[in-house]
Amino acid sequence: MILIAALIKLTSRGSVFYTQTRIGIDRRKFGEPPGNSRRRHDCGGKPFTIYKFRTMAPHRGPHGAGEVWALSNDPRVTPVGRVLRKYRLDELPQLINVLRGEMNVVGPRPEQPTIFARLRQEIERYEERQRVRPGITGWAQINQSYDSCVDDVRRKLAYDLEYIHRQSALEDLRIMLRTLPVVIGKKGAW
């Protein structure tokens, strides 16, 4: 991880890490009403800060902020970032999130609050993925690449719900082992 951090720092300006708010596990009992008298806003789970290695030039181009679908040949991605994404090495700092108890190694990928709010309105059962702690890798990630539209998210949701139904230590081990060929075979981002 030190080598990756040095490469990022030597080849582009800005921080080595990229942080962003994501939505974590929703500890309410399933079927409980979404409101909570102590919360002003129901965000569908506990927000947390996710850590990644920075793969894009900071605030470059028209997409300086906000949520955007990942783009093939995105001009914002740095040369080092392209390699990190290809091998999914940009996800390594999420081990910090695992140690903090915010994520597991295996589980549905955590989403940004604004995207989560929109998707749970558009896609039936989307909020059910919050019944488990989010993960660095998951059943959806080894079966499908990055999302580029809502239909991709629907397909990934089917995998996430299947994982939740079958979740066990043995299933997690199987997914971790199946993640290795995805990483080694460069089946990550474009």
Protein language model regions, located:
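Positions in alpha-helical segments
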Residues: Y18, T78-R82, Y159
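A hydrophobic, helix-centered structural microdomain
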Residues: M1-H59, A169-W190
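Adenylate-forming
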Residues: I4-A5, I50, G64-E67, W139-Q141
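C-terminal terminal-structure detector
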Residues: I123-W190
